[in-house]
Amino acid sequence: MSDQLADQLKATSLSSGPEDWKKGLNLPARDTRQQTEDVTNTRGLDWEDFIHDRDLLMGIFEAGFEKPSPIQEEAIPVALTGRDILARAKNGTGKTAAFVIPALNKINPKVSKIQCLILVPTRELAMQTSQVCKTLGKHLGINVMVTTGGTGLRDDIVRLQDPVHIVVGTPGRILDLAGKQVADLSECPMFIMDEADKLLSQEFTPVIEQLLQFHPKDRQVMLFSATFPLSVKDFSDKNMTSPYEINLMDELTLRGITQYYAFVEEKQKVHCLNTLFSKLQINQSIIFCNSTNRVELLAKKITELGYSCFYSHAKMAQQARNRVFHDFRNGVCRNLVCSDLLTRGIDIQAVNVVINFDFPKNAETYLHRIGRSGRYGHLGLAINLINWDDRFNLYNIERDLGTEIQPIPQTIDKSLYVYENPESIPRPISTFKPIAQQPQQQLQQSQRPQQSQQQQHFSTQTQPSNQLPPQQGNQQLGFNPQAQQPHRPIPQAQGDWQGQNGRQNGTGASNNQPRPTNYQNNRGQPGSSRGGRGRGFQGQGGRQNQNYGGQRGPRTQGQGQPQGPLSAQ
């Protein structure tokens, strides 16, 4: 017995340094992609400089967070002191972790009370934020609950019977639970608002002020956003105590995002989008429209062209929205068409291209849209399809943001948005398990039960797009007359998106992207061409450049107004 004890003592060694505990961590593969100064311009601090809880540090490192970003360096030490914070930083620079980490550090797991309330404007952002809380705090024994509208109250009421330390949700649902005295916020010391500018708009402000009445008077209030209108200052003066202001917006747009515009007639936009798909090397893309009807119509057209596509908007059933959000995050589909529902805070690092099929009306919406690419200092591409009515909005947005959106060139350098090893791009923090693949008809019925089958076109592609090579293209974005295929018209849509005066000259849809398994009326079979010759954009001065239906010169004046009526917005 004594010999065995002696052998064990010989085999036992004391810790040789403070870093030994890191050797047993389950660290993800390191992201070796290039990063811009948006996240690298730091003071050189480490997580250990302001976080001393080893269990929290384990969650931080296992989530792949190697060094704090500038907003995290500025906000976390102040938040730990309990002071109110007004923090403004660019999209995709780590604002979520900047308030989640200090909140986790200050929570006492032994106290069975709600100790932190995090408000977000959308349901998708609520789910994403709750997953960040769960992942970073997985070693702390902290319970996180997410609650949003669109679902029944029963599950939330049952869940709140058990200890909950952090509640993440949308304002209306939280107010409903607090008003019914189901959620006890009387001892909740932390009140956090992400995307605070949206939450303090006229739509949400009355709800926010009512929610504050359920909190103790000595609460800590923290506001985070990329844009702060005057409504934020009014709220701060009324409800915050000497807030510490952080402003890291030396410029408004992310440095890693390259912005272009293509001037194109409304009825030629689908042709232009088809060309972009076939020429650009897209890992994942988000395509924005200005209305829910146009979202569904465009998703239908994209699927008919032979590309995998999901769509999402606010009028969909919550279950369908959840499935689309999770599947797209996990790489099930390459392209997502959506309204402004997903412009706020959604973090999908595999997205390298954002396309504004409908140009936004204001600079704030534009800034949040293009911020879906180029996440956390990485590279991205934003392409805007501009018609004649958008020319003044383009000028105003350039002026308000202090940036210049260049005309799209014949050739786009791959180094601006393409990574050599897309399979190494990390997926967002998520514990979601992909839903088993269902037949096409079931998927259509789960998304829009009230629609007919012919109006539903969801792809059943299940292979993650970040493990597929980016769509290959020769980067020559103009139409190539020598590469024409036999002419075949694009299927007619429910709108004036098909040109009445001829079609552009192109090679049609590329076969490099995964194609859906079902096609309406036998359209879109592999190998078919969707090219055609046409005059594109024509002005008074004669025929213009046919790339993208004609690329216009100066944006504020010119003689090339499109002929004929544009389609209805």
From Swiss-Prot:
It is found in: Cytoplasm, P-body. The keyword Transport applies. GO terms for molecular function: ATP binding; ATP hydrolysis activity; mRNA binding; RNA helicase activity. Residues 76-246 form the Helicase ATP-binding domain. One of its GO terms (cellular component) is cytoplasmic stress granule. Keywords: ATP-binding, Cytoplasm, Helicase, Hydrolase, mRNA processing, mRNA transport, Nucleotide-binding, RNA-binding, Translation regulation, Transport. A motif (Q motif) lies at residues 45-73. Residues 256-416 form the Helicase C-terminal domain. Residues 529-542 have a biased composition (Gly residues). It holds the Pfam family Helicase_C. Residues 437-482, 543-569 have a biased composition (Low complexity). This is ATP-dependent RNA helicase dhh1. It comes from Neurospora crassa (strain ATCC 24698 / 74-OR23-1A / CBS 708.71 / DSM 1257 / FGSC 987). The lineage of its organism: Eukaryota, Fungi, Dikarya, Ascomycota, Pezizomycotina. The gene is drh-10.
